[in-house]
Amino acid sequence: MEEKFRNCILGLAVGDALGMPVEGLSIENIRQLYGEVRDFLPSPYGDLNAGEWTDDTEQMVVLAESILETVYFDPENFAERLKRWFLETNSRRIGPSSTKAISNLMRGVHWTRAGVFSDTCGAAMRVAPIGLVYHFSLNLVERYAEISARVTHTGTAAIGGAVAVAVAIACNVLDFSDEEMLEEVLRRVEAYDNLLAEKIRYANEISDRDVEYAVEKLGNSISSLDVVPMAFYSYFAGKDFEESLIKAVNAGGDADSIAAICGAIKGAKGFAIPERWLEGLKDREFLEELATKLYELHMRIVKLT
């Protein structure tokens, strides 16, 4: 089980770093500039080097460290940590909804009112630690995913996206089959956003089609209605970690978030991450230590319950 924690956290960061240089590009642009992205590349804007990750991984770390401090998820602690991170980060890629919500928090707005009514994917991209630590109770995973989303995002698709990703990760740690995992995800997401649930279902149905077809049908914008289904498409379409991540990255659009989410879900299933990606990943040892701490916290919680 500890390996699944490790591969989930590292998988998220690997996907983020792979998608970073092509974030915002169309499939056609990616092909013209790079052919097919299969390895880490530097940002064309000069802000990040090959193997470095973006705010997707940074916010995941913020959430993980909050959980490690509070044991059970505390939205007030998470909100305070988001404020601190926002002041300290050098990232120039923070999404519009997160930026506005954290700005609200910094102006003294309580976390219950600071969130922005938006369907962007900031809550889904960072939620992995919740699916890992609390996988012993899918109801708790769903509840914490929802609350963690509301700190910055209050749109139904944004919340549903966070629930989908967290529940998928928890199910994979629990060794659910892909069919059982999908059924559990859909059942819970339907309570938040029917369209998102239908698109995730469809993502599985078209997983034998190519990436161009998937992007045409599902989209690749920053909306959770696009990012989360595309991440599930990539998950189901690849026979292993590498194939899924290459599909996710080369989908373009919000490629780093699509690939980060796909990498987290795929890693939680236990798929091995190619060593060449791990060797080039920024702060690999820090992320491995973070995963170990999350696993140890999970074990302590289980012993107490």
UniProtKB/Swiss-Prot annotation:
Gene Ontology MF terms in the entry: hydrolase activity
Keywords: Hydrolase
Group of enzyme by EC: hydrolase
Entry-linked InterPro entries: ADP-ribosylglycohydrolase, Ribosyl_crysJ1, Ribosyl_crysJ1_sf
EC number: 3.2.2.-
Protein family: Belongs to the ADP-ribosylglycohydrolase family.
PANTHER family named in the record: ADP-RIBOSYLGLYCOHYDROLASE, ADP-RIBOSYLHYDROLASE ARH3
Name this protein carries in UniProt: Uncharacterized protein AF_1724
